[in-house]
């Protein structure tokens, strides 16, 4: 980054500091990952200069012959990975992908059935502070009070009662396998569309390690980062009969020019996901998450649903007499990055919370394995149990430093 360093020392310094943070801390935020240098090179390419409103072969600008190739590569690779009939890779984010689906099939005030945010849903699944909850009449389903797993009988009962036009499946903090086939059966029974938001599990689906929602859903949305390990962005997969409507909802509906440099980075990441070693990577994500969950439970920590089937773990910290906010802060102080998170049947404010959400996608990309998961579980428990003991916290910092020093990253940057 010699040019940047010469041109803007302040921005360069901030980027260098962030690189140092990523190298020196253990990244356990479930929605984050470390992309390859190839993905970063594509995103930092000259494609950032090109306007390309429209779609390949139907642009509103000239000079799009090369970016057309890039977008076609991205779309074709997604179709190959997930078996989708139609793909739109232009959404700037998962939220905009969800918005486009809503705009395609819903009218203002239509009823939608979505997962309660504190039970594991997402802001765009009907939260009253989000456009989805403002524009549409969302009815919430959740998890069982004892098992913390989705109660499909309750979903069916609410679907029959409220007759939603759309049912939204998928979550941002649900550590168990979701039965998409059952969701489609429920949707068909009440005459609703089914949209699956697979943002968190897309990489696991790509590797064949989580049921694929594409055969069951009318629409599938996802981010392209998280377990898929691409750049930050979104995309939509749908049945061919909805292709024109979806494309119009993205452009000119809610977006203008696509970010062609990001789409190039998406294409590179999709190519990586088609390689044999990506399945090994995804398997390691799950193995690491399950080993970490076991270690946390051995240390006496309480996990929502009692464990995990995917990359994600939700810790209930109430029995430690601390809040999620305090847990996030003290773990960050020792070099472990997590996020505070609501838990099912939450009583605390979303700015405070009773839980912490962690995930293993990023540490797995870094090369951490089962032994490292045992050590991380021990450090987390040690830190949370001794969160006011500076001597204990200093010991935790040293243990984190030992771990991160064994797994250098981005050494060419």
Swiss-Prot record:
Domain of life (superkingdom): Bacteria
An example Gene Ontology molecular-function term: glycine hydroxymethyltransferase activity
Chain positions found as N6-(pyridoxal phosphate)lysine: 226
Reaction catalysed by this enzyme: (6R)-5,10-methylene-5,6,7,8-tetrahydrofolate + glycine + H2O = (6S)-5,6,7,8-tetrahydrofolate + L-serine
Record-linked PROSITE patterns: SHMT
Main location: cytoplasm
InterPro entries listed in its UniProt record: PyrdxlP-dep_Trfase, PyrdxlP-dep_Trfase_major, PyrdxlP-dep_Trfase_small, Ser_HO-MeTrfase, Ser_HO-MeTrfase-like, Ser_HO-MeTrfase_PLP_BS, SHMT-like_dom
Keyword field: Amino-acid biosynthesis, Cytoplasm, One-carbon metabolism, Pyridoxal phosphate, Transferase
One of the record's GO cellular component terms: cytosol
Protein's GO biological process: glycine biosynthetic process from serine; tetrahydrofolate interconversion
HAMAP family associated with the record: SHMT (MF_00051)
Protein purpose: Catalyzes the reversible interconversion of serine and glycine with tetrahydrofolate (THF) serving as the one-carbon carrier. This reaction serves as the major source of one-carbon groups required for the biosynthesis of purines, thymidylate, methionine, and other important biomolecules. Also exhibits THF-independent aldolase activity toward beta-hydroxyamino acids, producing glycine and aldehydes, via a retro-aldol mechanism.
PANTHER family recorded: SERINE HYDROXYMETHYLTRANSFERASE (PTHR11680), SERINE HYDROXYMETHYLTRANSFERASE 1 (PTHR11680:SF35)
Protein name: Serine hydroxymethyltransferase
Record organism: Bacillus cytotoxicus (strain DSM 22905 / CIP 110041 / 391-98 / NVH 391-98)
């Amino acid at each position: 980054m010699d040019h940047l360093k010469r041109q803007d020392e302040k921005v360069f310094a901030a980027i260098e500091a962030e690189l140092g943070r990523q190298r020196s801390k253990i990244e356990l935020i479930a929605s984050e990952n470390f992309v390859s240098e190839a993905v970063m090179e594509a995103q930092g390419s000259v494609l950032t200069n090109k306007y390309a409103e429209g779609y390949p072969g139907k642009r509103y600008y000239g000079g799009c012959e090369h970016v057309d190739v890039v977008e076609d590569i991205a779309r074709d690779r997604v179709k190959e990975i997930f078996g989708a009939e139609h793909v739109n890779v232009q959404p700037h984010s998962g939220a905009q992908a969800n918005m486009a689906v809503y705009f395609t099939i819903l009218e203002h005030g239509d009823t939608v059935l979505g997962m309660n945010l504190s039970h594991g849903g997402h802001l765009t699944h009907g939260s009253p502070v989000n456009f989805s909850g403002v524009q549409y009449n969302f009815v919430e389903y959740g998890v069982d009070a004892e098992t913390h797993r989705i109660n499909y009988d309750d979903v069916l009962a609410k679907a029959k009662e409220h007759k939603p036009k759309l049912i939204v499946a998928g979550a941002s903090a649900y550590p168990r396998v979701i039965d998409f086939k059952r969701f489609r059966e429920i949707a068909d029974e009440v005459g609703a569309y089914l949209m699956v938001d697979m943002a968190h599990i897309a990489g696991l689906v790509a590797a064949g390690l989580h049921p694929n929602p594409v055969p069951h859903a009318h629409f599938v949305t996802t981010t392209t980062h998280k377990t898929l390990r691409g750049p930050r962005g979104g995309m939509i997969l749908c049945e061919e009969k909805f292709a024109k409507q979806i494309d119009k909802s993205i452009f000119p509906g809610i977006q203008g020019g696509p970010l062609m440099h990001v789409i190039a980075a998406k294409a590179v990441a999709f190519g990586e996901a088609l390689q044999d070693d990506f399945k090994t990577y995804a398997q390691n994500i799950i193995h690491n998450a399950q080993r970490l969950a076991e270690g946390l439970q051995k240390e006496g920590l309480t996990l929502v649903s009692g464990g995990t089937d995917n990359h994600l773990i939700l810790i209930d910290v109430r029995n430690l007499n601390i809040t999620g906010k305090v847990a996030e802060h003290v773990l960050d102080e020792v070099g472990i990055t997590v996020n505070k998170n609501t838990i099912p049947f939450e009583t605390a404010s979303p700015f405070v919370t009773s839980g912490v959400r962690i995930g293993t996608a990023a540490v797995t990309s870094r090369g951490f394995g089962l032994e490292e998961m045992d050590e991380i579980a021990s450090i987390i428990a040690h830190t949370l149990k001794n969160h006011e003991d500076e001597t204990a916290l200093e010991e935790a910092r040293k243990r984190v430093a030992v771990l991160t020093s064994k797994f250098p990253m981005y050494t060419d940057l």
